[in-house]
Amino acid sequence: MPLIPMVIEQTSRGERAFDIYSRLLKDRIVFIGSAIDDETANLLIAQLLFLESEDPDKDINFYINSPGGKVSAGMAIYDTMQYIKSDIATVCIGHAASMGAFLLAAGAKGKRFSLPNSRIMIHQPMGGAQGQASDIAIQAKEILRMKDILNQILAHHTGKPLEQIQVDTDRDFFMSGEEAKAYGIVDHVITDRSDLDKLEKPQEA
């Protein structure tokens, strides 16, 4: 298990210690830096719901550095992003692949960012099947169903024709930040915090 850094802050009552993720949460920042599984999804969903309950009219900044992961876990995060009232600004740092790229594209329109050296990759869902032939057929049918759903949602968020999404996701499709911008997965490629700061200022006015 990786070591989680602690942050010490001075308060009127003395020193207070936070783990780094709790401290980021105070600034309405959530971060995923691993593969997406059920545990990761549950933690992230809880954070999103908490931040919405704190202030539904204030943006949430969602930083993504993930190779992707379990489709059902990613879809649970996606549905929560669409469900809550708060706009979610997504930021790719490092790489966003598979479900990571899917969640990156699912941010609020105009508030989806990539750092300049990030890599983004989309592809079709993968799955292994074993057991009796009838069981394998059922699992294959479910994978095809999820593929269609994911492609339709990606087409919605990128503005690309569904036919193009189907072709591009048939194999691993890698993009730079600028290429992801042209594709419609992100809206801006940023090198510093100025774009995010400009985004936050109107809310404070």
UniProtKB/Swiss-Prot annotation:
The active site is at S98, H123. It comes from the Bacteria. The keyword Cell membrane does not apply. InterPro entries: ClpP (IPR001907), ClpP/crotonase-like_dom_sf (IPR029045), ClpP/TepA (IPR023562), ClpP_His_AS (IPR033135), ClpP_Ser_AS (IPR018215). Keywords: Cytoplasm, Hydrolase, Protease, Serine protease. It is found in: Cytoplasm. Pfam families: CLP_protease. One of its GO terms (molecular function) is ATP-dependent peptidase activity. It is an enzyme of class 3 (hydrolase). Its main location: cytoplasm. Belongs to the peptidase S14 family. Fourteen ClpP subunits assemble into 2 heptameric rings which stack back to back to give a disk-like structure with a central cavity, resembling the structure of eukaryotic proteasomes. Cleaves peptides in various proteins in a process that requires ATP hydrolysis. Has a chymotrypsin-like activity. Plays a major role in the degradation of misfolded proteins. This is ATP-dependent Clp protease proteolytic subunit. It comes from Desulfosudis oleivorans (strain DSM 6200 / JCM 39069 / Hxd3).
